[in-house]
Regions:
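ATP-dependent carboxylate activation and anion-phosphoryl transfer catalytic cores
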Residues: 1, 5-269
């Protein structure tokens, strides 16, 4: 252990002229949980949590919510609102945490912006977060109180990246054809269309496919159908991976950590 520390200090000294290093606690069985917050510079409210532990290269692939008990949501929600109010935060923010196997939370960071997965929260609360963020940014006070926020059903989002589903290598090219599902409980946010040139030098996100259900099982069933109905021709994509995840026993049993993809290499095909 001392050897590793000394080596790290040596590298820090040579790279930055400062040998001080931070030692962080290893979180066993870590899960990624984040809270959506809106502040007006004086007060803050939260819109609950999103569960984002299915990741590749520390970037999210599947997000869903809600995930926590009502009691834990109330506890952590009060803390994040207090944090936002203490710095006079104005706008949308995401407070991100790691949760260990014992259920304890460890603060990671605040993302001071709207997140890709804000759509999950919109489906389960019924509020347009982008609109609320704009209204607050232009000087309005919070138009809602915490008691106005309730959660209904369950939502899941799959990121349909233009990537090789085995190695996650970007797959640029022309979309010769594409079709995205619609209907009750389905939302798809995308810029894709037949003839679109998917670039290789920017983020590989092609579409966000979401489903809402009365409970998690209902949302999963609807996501299976939505994935089956989605057609993308011309580039590789992650639909096969997402489809396998929706049937995987650990996923269905909520036995998910940030090592999920690493521990389920068979899902990559």
């Amino acid at each position: 252990e001392m050897c590793i520390r000394d080596r790290c200090m040596s590298r820090a000294k040579s790279a930055f002229g400062d040998e001080r290093v931070f030692v962080e606690k290893y979180i066993q069985g870590a899960q990624h949980v984040e809270f959506q917050v809106l502040g007006d510079g004086k007060n803050a409210i939260h819109f609950g949590e999103r569960f984002c532990s299915i990741q590749r290269r520390h970037q999210k692939l599947v997000e869903e919510g809600p995930w926590l008990s009502d009691e834990k949501r109330q506890e952590i929600g009060a803390l994040v609102c207090k944090g936002a109010e203490s710095v006079g935060y104005k706008g949308l923010a995401t407070f991100e945490f790691l949760r260990d196997a014992n259920g304890d939370f460890y603060f990671l960071e605040v993302n001071p912006r709207v997140q890709v997965e804000h759509t999950v929260t919109e489906l389960i609360t019924g509020y347009n977060l982008v609109e609320l963020g704009i209204r607050v940014a232009q000087g309005e006070d919070l138009p809602l109180s915490q008691s106005d926020i309730t959660w209904r059903g369950h939502a899941i989002q799959c990121r349909l990246n233009a990537e090789d589903p085995k190695e996650f290598v970007p797959s640029p090219g022309r979309l010769w054809d594409c079709h995205f599902p619609s209907g009750f409980g389905i939302r798809c946010d995308t810029h894709a269309h037949p003839g679109y040139e998917m670039p290789g030098c920017f983020d590989s996100l092609l579409a966000k496919l979401l489903t809402w259900g009365h409970d998690r099982e209902d949302a999963v069933r609807r996501m299976r159908t939505a994935l089956d109905e989605t057609q993308i021709t011309g580039v590789q994509h992650l639909i096969p991976l997402h489809r396998r995840i929706m049937d995987e026993p650990d996923f269905l049993n909520r036995d998910i950590t940030i090592q999920y993809i690493d521990n389920h290499q068979d899902l990559l095909g």
